[in-house]
Amino acid sequence: MRILIAFAAVVLADCSSGPSPERNATREPWYGQTIVQLASIDRQAENAFKAGKSDQAAALIQQGQPLMDRLLAVPKPTLEAVEAASDLDDLYGRMLLSNRHYGWARMFFQKNVARWKHWTPQTPGTESRLKQANSAIEECDRHIGD
């Protein structure tokens, strides 16, 4: 009798439904809203940097960092999210480069190389971003020995 009960328990356990499918966070409303927020911060920080307001640009970059982290924490972030994150890192790298912090700047540009080198599918836009990041690294490397 115990064997029959054990067998029934195994069969019933095996028939249970599997784990529920994971929700795709990129389809949640917060995800799209966060991309819009980060892209807006990117533009504001870029404009501040171009206007010579480095402190304001730096504050905006800090404000965008948690948004970037949240967007990239999902299993498969969208192209738009990665582009917004890339723009933030590129701007920060350029700011560091302009302040002669070549090693730190190189690190931020290297993050973009890693992003775009491994992005699939490759598009003209992602290839252009990869080329831009590699050029920025070359610029850093020219100055590191100074």
Question: Model regions: which residues?
Answer:
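Residue signature of alpha-solenoid helical repeat architecture, marking inter-repeat boundaries
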Residues: E28, G32-V36, K76-E83, S128
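Bacterial Sec signal peptide processing site at the extreme N-terminus
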Residues: S16-P29
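Alpha-helical junction/boundary sensor with strong preference for TPR arrays
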Residues: M68-P75, R115-T123
